[in-house]
């Protein structure tokens, strides 16, 4: 398990897992931003198709509507980033509550008999409990990271498939049937690969949880 998740350890030659998570979340946001723009372009093309191809070529509102939607979506995403960072800082600022098992055991009678032997005998379970708590905390962090990355990757795949569908709709509306069917095929391939993404991350979760349950 340590070798499987050795990339989570800090080091000079290893990228921080937090940086990787932020890159994945940013890429996911960019995918959905692109989907917003392409879907608006497809909707405008369909409306122009209802009026006729000649009006679509001379309609000056198409570009401005598309740019306005992209700018508004970008502002929403940029405004959400400080909120997420503030929530993360508040979560990190909360003091970690750890059980005070060592102090409770230390209050027992150690003075009678052999104090040194009893102190060593009672410190062994305390050290074992501390090691177990550290391992459980590390395992919980790994599980949370797998959940986050799996959700982000699956959401990005859904966004890519929707981009392909919106692009295919736009291409078919403007009369490019060949590229449109290619885009539909790409959307089908991405959709077919979504269960594989879920299976891969569920497999990683089982690898992390299995040693703790045994």
UniProtKB/Swiss-Prot annotation:
UniProt membrane topology term: Multi-pass membrane protein
Location of the region described as Disordered in the Swiss-Prot/TrEMBL record: 96-115
Give the stretches traversing the membrane.
23-43, 65-85, 152-172, 181-201
Q: Which compartments does it reside in? A: Cell membrane
Q: Does the keyword Transmembrane apply?
A: yes
Highest taxon above the source species: Bacteria
What keywords were assigned to this record? Cell membrane, Membrane, Transmembrane, Transmembrane helix
Which named protein is this?
Uncharacterized protein MT2253
């Amino acid at each position: 398990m340590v070798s499987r998740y050795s990339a989570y350890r800090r080091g000079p030659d290893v990228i921080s897992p937090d940086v990787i998570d932020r890159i994945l979340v940013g890429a996911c946001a960019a995918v959905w931003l692109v989907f917003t723009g392409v879907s608006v372009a497809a909707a405008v093309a369909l409306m122009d198709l209802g009026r006729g191809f000649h009006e679509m070529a001379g309609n000056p509102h198409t570009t401005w509507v598309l740019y306005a939607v992209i700018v508004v979506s970008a502002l929403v995403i940029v405004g959400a980033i400080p909120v997420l960072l503030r929530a993360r800082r508040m979560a990190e600022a909360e003091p970690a509550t750890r059980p005070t098992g060592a102090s409770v055991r230390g209050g027992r009678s150690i003075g009678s008999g052999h104090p040194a032997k009893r102190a060593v005998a009672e410190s062994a379970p305390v050290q074992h409990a501390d090691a177990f708590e550290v391992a459980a905390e590390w395992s919980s962090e790994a599980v949370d990271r797998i959940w986050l990355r799996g959700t982000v990757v699956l959401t990005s795949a859904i966004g890519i498939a929707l981009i392909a569908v919106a692009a295919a709709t736009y291409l078919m509306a403007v009369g490019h049937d060949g590229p449109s069917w290619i885009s539909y095929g790409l959307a089908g391939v991405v959709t077919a690969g979504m269960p594989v993404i879920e299976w891969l991350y569920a497999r990683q979760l089982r690898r992390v949880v299995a040693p703790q349950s045994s």
